[in-house]
C-alpha cells in the first residue's frame, strides 16, 4: 500500500493480507483480523476532520463485505460523535458473529439483540445504510437521516426475544419465546425497529411458514409481536404457548 500526506490532508491505498485492525471505537470487536483488505481513503483536517472512504473490501472467516462512505467530525462549539454517510454490502457473514462487525453507531439495543438472538446460520445479500448526525441515532423522526440494515438469513436458529437483552434475570422471568430453527428469513433493521420475515422455520417439531416477528423499538423494554402459520402436533402447539410469553 501507500500513504501520501501534505498540509493537513492525505490519502491511503491498501492492498494487504493477514492484517489486524484496532477498531475499539468503531465496531464491537476491538481487534479485527482480516485475511484480505483493500481500501482507498482520503482525508483532510481543515476546517474539521473529514474522511472519505472511496472503497473498502475486506474478508476473513466470518465476513466478506464492501463499503464506501464519508465521515465528518463535529466542529466549532459542537461536540459529539460526528456525521456519517455509509453504504455497505455484505457478501457473506457467519450469523452469530454479526454483532462484532456492526458499527457501534447502531446502538446497544441493536448490538445486544444481534449478539444473543442469532444463534446459528449464515447471512447473504446484506446491505447497510447509515446517514446522519450520529448523536441523534437511530434517527427516529429525522427526515434527512437514515439507518437501515437488510439481509437474507438462511439455515438459521433464532432467539427472537432473548431474555438477556430484556434485562430479565430470574428463572421465571427468563421464560421467553422458544428457539426458532431451520429458518430462511429476511432481516430488517429500520431506524429503531427490527422485523424478521420468515418463509419457513420450525419450533419444536411444528413447521412454521409466513412468520413475521417485529419489535417496533429495540431497547430494554422492547415489545415483540409475532404472527404466522404453524403446522404440527397439538401437543407442540400447547407447549409453545406454555413456554412463551403468550401464557402470561
Regions found by a protein language model. Name each.
Residues 1-52, 63-203, 207-248:
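Membrane-proximal interfacial segments on either side of biological membranes
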Amino acid at each position: 500500500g501507500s500513504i501520501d500526506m501534505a498540509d493537513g490532508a492525505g490519502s491511503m491505498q491498501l492492498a494487504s493480507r493477514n492484517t489486524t485492525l484496532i477498531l475499539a471505537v468503531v465496531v464491537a470487536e476491538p481487534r479485527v483480523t482480516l485475511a484480505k483488505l483493500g481500501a482507498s481513503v482520503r482525508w483532510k483536517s481543515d476546517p474539521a476532520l473529514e474522511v472519505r472512504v472511496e472503497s473498502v473490501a475486506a474478508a476473513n472467516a466470518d465476513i466478506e463485505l464492501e463499503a464506501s462512505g464519508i465521515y465528518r467530525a463535529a466542529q466549532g462549539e459542537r461536540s459529539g460523535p460526528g456525521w456519517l454517510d455509509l453504504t455497505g454490502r455484505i457478501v457473506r457473514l457467519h450469523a452469530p458473529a454479526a454483532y462484532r462487525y456492526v458499527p457501534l453507531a447502531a446502538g446497544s439495543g441493536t448490538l445486544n439483540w444481534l449478539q444473543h438472538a442469532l444463534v446459528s446460520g449464515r447471512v447473504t445479500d446484506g446491505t447497510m445504510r447509515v446517514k446522519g448526525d450520529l448523536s441523534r441515532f437511530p434517527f427516529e423522526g429525522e427526515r434527512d437521516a437514515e439507518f437501515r440494515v437488510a439481509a437474507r438469513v438462511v439455515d438459521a436458529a433464532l432467539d427472537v426475544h432473548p431474555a438477556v437483552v430484556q434485562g430479565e434475570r430470574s428463572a421465571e422471568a427468563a421464560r421467553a419465546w422458544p428457539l426458532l430453527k431451520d429458518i430462511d428469513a429476511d432481516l430488517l433493521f429500520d431506524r429503531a425497529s427490527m422485523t424478521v420475515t420468515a418463509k419457513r422455520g420450525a419450533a419444536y417439531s411444528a413447521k412454521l411458514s409466513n412468520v413475521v416477528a417485529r419489535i417496533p423499538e429495540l431497547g430494554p423494554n422492547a415489545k415483540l409481536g409475532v404472527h404466522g402459520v404453524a403446522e404440527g402436533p397439538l401437543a407442540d402447539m400447547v407447549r409453545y404457548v406454555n413456554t412463551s410469553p403468550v401464557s402470561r
